[in-house]
């Protein structure tokens, strides 16, 4: 029997009621005391999926398949055997090759695993339509209200559309209200939007009492009615303020546009900056971001101009101007914040005017191009299939040769279609607790549980990301073997679970296995 001697002097110093007699454990029990461990670790990613949608999915819900890498790395730990068979440790693990490739060339059900007829039937699919960002109605400032009240009518004897064009445009851009709407009684006609009659106009409690009756009709050329409508719209817009800042709304809007056009920009070698506007963006940063967006959209349009008829002809011109109230703001923090919000709101309104600034037409043209390219590819595949059928008269050898050629081309296409979606590194620190389940000779089977933090950095879509820190938990089941006096070999397998997502896209869970040497001091 092995004895661990408890020194009498130490016990006396601690005033503990123990004698100097030895405490005896079974020969195969693990010794109490501190230990250190070093080892290697490897695993397989689990639960993570591509953030890219499969363009072949008409519902726009299916994600492209991922080819996941096998993470590997090293682990270091320091711990304490608390009682025989129970130990606690602090461990650090560094994982490399946390990566995955997306199969751009393989569209799920497009795989040629069926008959020729099946392959031909699945060639033409309905593509998800590109949809421009929806307009955002922003609160109207007092300065914008005062400017709008004084919008004049155009001189002359023209119709309302011409004389009140500036006022009609203000209603659309600032309030999202169309001045004219289709006439329900006459499909070919149009009437003044009845919503304009429901907007509070003027003082609801004028002197003398009795209230104020709503007008029977709205005349946009009438300056008094126009002033009252502008004041009413301003009050309503500020009563329904969004919960997020104008800068955040603008940043999200630009990010959505960039995400929509990115495939086309990549083909045209147009660089897209995926850095969002910070919440504290200055007026100059907002102006530069809008100018950058205008340049990117115009570069994409020019790149495809002439590829198909009657498309990409309307230039993209974002009519963004810094509001006059912003230009006169001081440098005080409160004034700077007001200027920031006003500039962001003006930029949002410039993007809202998609009919005139060219954004809506660009989306239509890109969708037309997408369908045109898909149709050409489908026709080529269909022609290849028809060529196979016609070649059957020439004998089996010709069919086999053509089939081999098609298979070889498919392999090449598949290789070209792979792109690294993310390539990350993870540093994981955990506090773990292990307990032996049972012991046989010099072997013991143990289970463990752990919790801690994971620090992740690297690249997503080829761009460096901001380092992410999140909570993780783990479970493990393993075997420990006593290979020498005080030296043990641990081999275990388990599951690492992440409680948060990186970039709000990827949840890095993994099945992991490790092997290490543990030395008891």
Swiss-Prot record:
The organism's place on the tree of life at top rank: Bacteria
Signal peptide coordinates: 1-22
GO cellular component annotations of the record: plasma membrane
Annotated localization: Cell membrane
Region (Disordered): 386-415
Protein name (record): 56 kDa type-specific antigen
Membrane topology (UniProt): Multi-pass membrane protein
Positions with biased composition (Basic and acidic residues): 396-415
Transmembrane segments: 64-86, 469-484
Keywords from the named record: Cell membrane, Membrane, Signal, Transmembrane, Transmembrane helix, Virulence
NCBIfam families on file: Orientia_TSA56
Naturally occurring in which organism (per UniProt): Orientia tsutsugamushi
Function field: May be an adherent factor for rickettsial adsorption to the host-cell surface and a determinant of virulence of individual rickettsial strain. It is the major outer membrane protein.
């Amino acid at each position: 029997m092995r004895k661990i001697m408890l020194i009498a002097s130490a016990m006396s110093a601690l005033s503990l009621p123990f004698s100097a007699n030895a405490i005896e454990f079974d020969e195969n029990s693990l010794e109490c005391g501190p230990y250190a461990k070093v080892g290697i670790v490897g695993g397989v990613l689990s639960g993570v999926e591509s953030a890219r949608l499969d363009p072949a999915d008409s519902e726009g819900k299916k994600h492209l398949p991922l080819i996941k890498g096998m993470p590997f790395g090293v682990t270091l730990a320091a711990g304490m055997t608390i009682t025989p068979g129970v130990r606690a440790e602090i461990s650090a693990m560094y994982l490399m090759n946390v990566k995955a490739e997306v199969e751009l060339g393989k569209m799920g059900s497009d795989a040629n695993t069926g008959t020729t007829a099946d392959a031909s039937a699945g060639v033409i699919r309905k593509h998800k339509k590109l949809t421009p960002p929806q307009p955002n109605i922003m609160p109207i400032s007092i300065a914008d209200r005062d400017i709008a009240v004084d919008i004049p009518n155009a001189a002359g004897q023209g119709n309302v559309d011409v004389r009140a064009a500036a006022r009609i445009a203000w209603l659309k851009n600032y309030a999202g209200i169309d001045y004219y709407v289709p006439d329900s009684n006459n499909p070919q006609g149009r009437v003044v939007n009845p919503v304009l009659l429901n907007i509070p106009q003027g003082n609801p409690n004028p002197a003398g009492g009795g209230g104020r009756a709503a007008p029977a009709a709205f005349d946009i050329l009438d300056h008094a009615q126009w002033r009252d409508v502008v004041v009413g719209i301003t009050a309503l817009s500020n009563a329904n303020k969004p919960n997020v800042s104008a800068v955040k709304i603008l940043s999200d809007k630009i990010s959505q546009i960039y995400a929509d056009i990115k495939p086309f920009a990549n083909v045209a070698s147009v660089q897209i900056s995926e850095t969002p506007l910070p919440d504290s963006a200055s007026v100059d940063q907002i102006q530069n971001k809008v100018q950058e967006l205008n340049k990117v959209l115009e570069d994409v349009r020019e790149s495809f101009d002439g590829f198909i008829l009657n498309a990409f002809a309307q230039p993209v011109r974002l009519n963004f101007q810094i509001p006059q109230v912003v230009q006169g703001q001081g440098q005080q923090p409160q004034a700077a914040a007001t200027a920031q919000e006003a500039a962001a709101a003006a930029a949002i309104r410039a993007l809202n005017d998609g009919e005139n600034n060219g954004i809506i037409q660009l989306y239509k043209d890109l969708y037309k191009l997408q369908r045109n390219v898909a149709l050409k590819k489908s026709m080529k595949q269909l022609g290849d299939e028809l060529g196979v059928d016609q070649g059957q008269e020439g004998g089996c050898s010709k069919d086999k040769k053509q089939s081999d050629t098609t298979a070889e081309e498919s392999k090449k296409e598949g290789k070209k279609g792979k792109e690294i979606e993310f390539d990350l590194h993870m540093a994981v620190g955990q506090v773990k607790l292990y307990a032996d389940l049972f012991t046989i000779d010099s072997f013991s089977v143990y289970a463990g549980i752990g919790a801690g933090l994971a620090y992740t950095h690297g690249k997503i879509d080829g761009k460096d990301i901001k380092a992410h820190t999140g909570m993780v938990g783990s479970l493990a089941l393993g075997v420990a073997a006593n290979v020498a006096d005080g030296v043990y070999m641990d081999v275990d397998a388990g599951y690492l679970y992440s409680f948060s997502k990186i970039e709000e896209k990827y949840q890095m869970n993994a099945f992991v296995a490790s092997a290490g040497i543990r030395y008891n001091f």
